Regions:
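Membrane-interface soluble catalytic domains
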Residues: 1-5, 9-16, 30-34, 41, ...
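Long acidic/mixed-charge intrinsically disordered regions
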Residues: 23-25, 64, 132
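Class I S-adenosylmethionine-dependent transferase superfamily signal
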Residues: 11, 47, 51, 65
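Flexible, surface-exposed loop/gating regions in the mature catalytic domains
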Residues: 25-28, 49
Length: 215
């Protein structure tokens, strides 16, 4: 089948061929990274070379490029570590604005850089794309274009303030900010478990289902 070099070449050719009109392309690459934790290392150099070639060819002159993962490594020993949990909840997101945007509206690119160390999510990326659409149709003020939707995000091209996971629209289940804490002592947990099992056994006994007693 096709290898990852083909889609990246297609992206370059696509941006060059349609450089005179607005376009959108989504390429999903999984060959080297999905099932192998070490695959990223072998893919990293090749991808960097491809991006440099695209930059030299002019394919990125007016292209807003987003390189992102949909999730981290979700199985295996690494996924059970603290770092593995963080990467799963906060996958890679790299945003490369075109030179034309920095020349025409440098404050937007400056906002993007300032937001680099803030908590962001896919909601913010969605609003960023809406922001770009507003710029594409020549709106001077884009606030009314990309706010007021069902998305809780904010454009990464706008100034952002430090936020909590709740404020950023991130479920607490996927929030990597709080540290893991032991909520109860082992002895208390054991007592609770024994009490629950006893209640279940009492409930099942008169039913005569032949169930083995839980312990």
């Amino acid at each position: 089948g096709r290898r990852h070099s083909d889609p990246t070449d297609l992206v370059r050719d696509f941006t060059l061929m349609y450089s005179d009109r607005p376009t959108f392309a989504h390429v999903h690459l999984t060959e080297y990274t999905h099932d192998d934790l070490n695959g990223v290392k072998s893919y990293d150099r090749d991808l960097a070379l491809k991006l440099r070639m695209m930059e030299r060819s002019g394919a990125l002159d007016d292209t807003f490029l987003v390189l992102m993962g949909d999730h981290g490594y979700r199985f295996g020993g690494f996924s059970k570590t603290r770092q593995g949990n963080v990467e799963n909840n906060m996958p890679l997101l790299l945003v490369m604005p075109p030179k034309s945007l920095e020349e025409e509206q440098p404050e937007l690119v400056r906002n993007l850089r300032d937001n680099n160390l803030l908590l962001t999510s896919h909601w913010d990326l969605h609003q960023t794309l809406r922001h770009l659409l507003a710029l594409g149709v020549g709106q001077q003020r884009v606030d009314t274009f990309y706010t007021g939707s069902l998305s809780p995000g904010s454009s990464l091209l706008s100034p952002l303030q430090p936020r909590t996971c709740t404020e950023a629209g991130i479920s607490l289940w996927f929030c990597s900010c709080p540290e893991d804490q032991r909520v109860i002592e082992p002895d208390v947990a054991r007592q609770l478990l024994e009490a629950v099992l006893e209640d279940i056994n009492v409930f099942l006994q008169p039913l005569e289902l032949g169930c083995q007693e839980l312990e």
